[in-house]
A protein has these predicted regions:
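Conserved short histidine dyad/triad with adjacent acidic residue
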Residues: 26-29, 37-57, 80, 91-95, ...
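Short solvent-exposed loop/turn micro-motifs enriched in small/polar/acidic residues
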Residues: 3-5, 55-56, 73, 93
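Short, ordered coil/turn segments that flank beta-strands lining enzyme active or ligand-binding pockets
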Residues: 14-15, 66, 75, 104
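A short beta-strand-loop-beta hairpin characteristic of the jelly-roll/cupin
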Residues: 55-56, 62-84
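Ligand-binding loop in jelly-roll beta-barrel domains
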Residues: 39, 75-86, 92-115
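Preference for bulky hydrophobic residues occupying beta-strand positions
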Residues: 44, 64, 72, 110-111
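A short, N-terminal "cap"/entry segment at the start of jelly-roll beta-barrel domains
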Residues: 1-46
Length: 115
């Protein structure tokens, strides 16, 4: 995956229930630049100790990383580190889900999306 000025990544469950990560280009997904289906927005800080095994999320969310590093793992055992400036569109609300490991204290904006 390339590292540009803004990295936008989608984490989703495939038809087989396995989780996957794909990079999105904002110019190909303009809807990400003007979200109107927002349920809640919150800013959160974490102390760097979260470590979760595979789990799906309870709702779709967009996560905008402000500081720190977070590692997300998918069903095929690939891992991706997200840093300040990266954006994750989390859509793996079914299936096996993903793993999560804080690599440092971090902060992020959580945008909870309506379906």
């Amino acid at each position: 995956m390339r590292r540009g000025a803004i990295g936008i990544y989608r984490i989703f469950a495939g038809s087989d229930g396995a989780s996957h990560i794909e990079e999105l280009r904002l110019e190909e997904h303009p809807e990400l630049g003007a979200l109107t289906n927002i349920h809640e927005v919150r800013v959160q800080q974490f102390d760097g100790t979260r470590k979760r095994d595979f789990n799906p999320l309870p709702e779709r969310r967009l996560i905008i990383h402000l500081s720190g590093e977070v590692e997300i793992g998918t069903s095929d055992d690939s891992r991706h580190v997200f840093r300040a400036g990266d954006i994750r569109l989390m859509e793996d609300v079914t299936g096996r889900g993903h793993t999560h490991v804080d690599r440092s204290p971090s902060s992020a904006v959580y945008v909870i999306l309506k379906d």
